[in-house]
């Protein structure tokens, strides 16, 4: 019997391959993905080690919330780089032949879920840290009486579960994550969108990401203004100067890195979801914005942890020397960066009556 007319089974992966292609990925090798993944893992591993050491040294109540959220952030970034990077390296090593190594579309679904979760969860955690820090600075009594470590853990769990829920929405709706045009990553359907549900997923992802950035921006701005006001009221304390200067720079760094890295990708996804631009015409741009977003996971540990302790101290000394100003004693900068950054919330550990007395005296 002739086999020329026999029908060959169609792999699910072949139906999920994009009809368009990206030429930008042609010039990249597997070495780029390996280096990129390694840098991210090492950066976040160093941040985790610093946080663990700081947590062992400082176990006060007013510091536990920040340490818990910061640890969750860098751990999320760590596993995001580890899982997504490993899958990307495997895809490159397999010559991007999805039909061969992922006939059942299981790997693409896992890749897409991890991409969405590792994208939204750090943004949610960043906004949660901004809210907690804003309340601790502006309302220390309320922060002490209403926001406990137990509450922070509950909010952290809620944020993680919500990010998982958003990542699982396509699977729950019997939709599949789609292999993108470059054939190196999986995400929501971005090519030839005709169904409202596919648009909903893209718009929901973009809206939640931009909302998290907006909340972080507003809360960090309020915190920064409050710190500047405190600085101007305590000019006689050099320790206050150094501490508030450090906090303002930290907040500016957090806002700038998050907005610069994530805004282009989120806006691109929103534009595709609203049919403002065609994915065929923006494939290379989408890949570029995706890489910008992944850089946020590398820069997070340096902004949140390392930048405050090492760079600001050296920059402070060098700037004053270059300006010809006598360098004052910098014993304050020798303290832990975590201790300095959180000292503004130290009042939250005091009894309510003592807090009221301190606030009245100031």
Swiss-Prot record:
Keywords: Cell membrane, Disulfide bond, G-protein coupled receptor, Glycoprotein, Membrane, Receptor, Transducer, Transmembrane, Transmembrane helix. It is found in: Cell membrane. GO terms for molecular function: prostaglandin F receptor activity. The keyword Cytoplasm does not apply. GO terms for cellular component: cytoplasm; extracellular region; plasma membrane. Disulfide bonds join 108-186. The chain crosses the membrane at residues 32-54, 70-90, 110-131, 153-175, 199-224, 251-267, 286-307. GO terms for biological process: adenylate cyclase-activating G protein-coupled receptor signaling pathway; cellular response to prostaglandin D stimulus; inflammatory response; negative regulation of apoptotic process; positive regulation of cell population proliferation; positive regulation of cytosolic calcium ion concentration; positive regulation of gene expression; response to estradiol. Pfam families: 7tm_1. It is a multi-pass membrane protein. Glycans are attached at residues 4, 19. Residues 1-31, 91-109, 176-198, 268-285 are extracellular. InterPro entries: GPCR_Rhodpsn, GPCR_Rhodpsn_7TM, PglndnF_rcpt, Prostanoid_rcpt, Prostglndn_DP_rcpt. Residues 55-69, 132-152, 225-250, 308-362 are cytoplasmic. Receptor for prostaglandin F2-alpha (PGF2-alpha). The activity of this receptor is mediated by G proteins which activate a phosphatidylinositol-calcium second messenger system. Initiates luteolysis in the corpus luteum. PANTHER family: G-PROTEIN COUPLED RECEPTOR FAMILY 1 MEMBER, PROSTAGLANDIN F2-ALPHA RECEPTOR. Belongs to the G-protein coupled receptor 1 family. This is Prostaglandin F2-alpha receptor. The lineage of its organism: Eukaryota, Metazoa, Chordata, Craniata, Vertebrata.
């Amino acid at each position: 019997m002739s086999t020329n007319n026999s029908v060959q089974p169609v792999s699910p992966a072949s139906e999920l391959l994009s009809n368009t292609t990206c030429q930008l990925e042609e010039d990249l090798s597997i070495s780029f993905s390996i280096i990129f993944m390694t840098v991210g893992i090492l950066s976040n591993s160093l941040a985790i080690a610093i946080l663990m050491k700081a947590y062992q040294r400082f176990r006060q109540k007013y510091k536990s919330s920040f340490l818990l959220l910061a640890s969750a952030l860098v751990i999320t970034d760590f596993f995001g780089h580890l899982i997504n990077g490993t899958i990307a390296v495997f895809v490159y090593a397999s010559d991007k032949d999805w039909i061969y190594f992922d006939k059942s579309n299981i790997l693409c679904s896992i890749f897409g879920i991890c991409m969405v979760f590792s994208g939204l969860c750090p943004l949610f955690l960043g906004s949660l840290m901004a809210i907690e820090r804003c309340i601790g600075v502006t309302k220390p009594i309320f922060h002490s009486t209403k926001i406990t470590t137990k509450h922070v853990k509950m909010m952290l769990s809620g944020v993680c579960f919500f990010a998982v829920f958003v990542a699982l929405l396509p699977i729950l709706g019997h939709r599949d994550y789609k292999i993108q045009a470059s054939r190196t990553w999986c995400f929501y359907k971005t090519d030839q969108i005709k169904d409202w549900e596919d648009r909903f997923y893209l718009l929901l992802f973009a809206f939640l990401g931009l909302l998290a950035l907006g909340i972080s921006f507003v809360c960090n701005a309020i915190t920064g203004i409050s710190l500047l006001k405190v600085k101007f009221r305590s000019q006689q304390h050099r320790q206050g100067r150094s501490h508030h200067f450090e906090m303002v720079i930290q907040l500016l760094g957090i806002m700038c890195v998050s907005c610069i890295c994530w805004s282009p990708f989120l806006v691109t996804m929103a534009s595709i979801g609203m049919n403002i631009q065609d994915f065929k015409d923006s494939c290379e741009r989408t890949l570029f914005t995706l890489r910008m977003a992944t850089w946020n996971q590398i820069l997070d540990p340096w902004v949140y942890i390392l930048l405050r302790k090492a760079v600001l101290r050296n920059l402070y000394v060098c700037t004053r020397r270059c300006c010809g100003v006598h360098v004052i004693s910098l014993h304050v900068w020798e303290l832990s960066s975590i201790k300095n950054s959180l000292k503004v919330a130290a009042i939250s550990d005091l009894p309510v009556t003592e807090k009221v007395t301190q606030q009245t005296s100031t």
